[in-house]
Amino acid sequence: MRLYRDNAVVLRQHKLGEADRIVTLLTRQHGLVRAVAKGVRRTKSKFGARLEPFAHIDVQLYPGRNLDIVTQVQTVDAFATDIVDDYTRYTTACAILETAERLAGEERAPALQLHRLTVGALRAVAEHHRPCELILDAFLLRAMGFAGWAPALDDCARCSAPGPHRAFHVAAGGAVCVQCRPPGAATPSPGVLDLMDALFRGDWASTEQVPEWLRGQASGLVAAHLQWHLERQLRTLPLIERARPHAAVGVEDSVRQDGDRDSTTRTPSSA
């Protein structure tokens, strides 16, 4: 079989034997690829450091039956240098990588848009020109859009009645009108859905003066919407929430609900 070359982001890695590692890559043309990097744990390895998580690389691989084999690596962007020494940046970048892997779909399914989005998000976190929570929420909203899970933020998610609407219900698909509003719908503060829409569209100018408590409400809704569709919580989000207490995933402390059940949670039988 012929060698192939692709642009990739290293999502994660784990040990294999005494000297090798298995790396999970999000590639531009081949989607998720799992490959063996032989000998990279040896001190004299010529490309071991280039295969650390957060790395943006140009990689050459040899197709294998179950796992491909890394034969050559060149660094495109060493994002880890500006990420790993800062807790907030590190946990944000970890959430980006975990989400990218979960939303990439089957192995080798092309994921050009998600790859481009992931590289851009890691670059934004590394450069730190904008708050990490806004970068993460923008990434999550757009990644959900690629997966077909984008929340309705203006028109009603159920009947398409023109908005804006005040209520938000994850199971319904986002913003809902008065007629369609189900029990347990959340009522975020004015401006929360506008912020989410601005992040989805990349309208960064509209996000600059948004207060932190309002960002927290938006973050809670974004995370809850994602986790509803994934049907289980991302491992990395609680780490971010401890650093950013206003953005609790349950959002019950910062968003008013109708009834006894929060629209952003599942019952045990429905998870």
Swiss-Prot record:
Q: Which residues cross the membrane?
A: none
Q: Which UniProt keywords apply?
A: DNA damage, DNA recombination, DNA repair
Write out the GO biological process terms: DNA recombination; double-strand break repair
- From start to end residue, where is composition biased (Basic and acidic residues)? 253-264
> Gene Ontology cellular component?
bacterial nucleoid
Where are the residues of the annotated region Disordered?
A: 248-271
Against Pfam families, the record matches this protein to: RecO_C, RecO_N
Family indicated by similarity: Belongs to the RecO family.
> Per its database record, what is this protein's job?
Involved in DNA repair and RecF pathway recombination.
Name-wise, this protein is DNA repair protein RecO
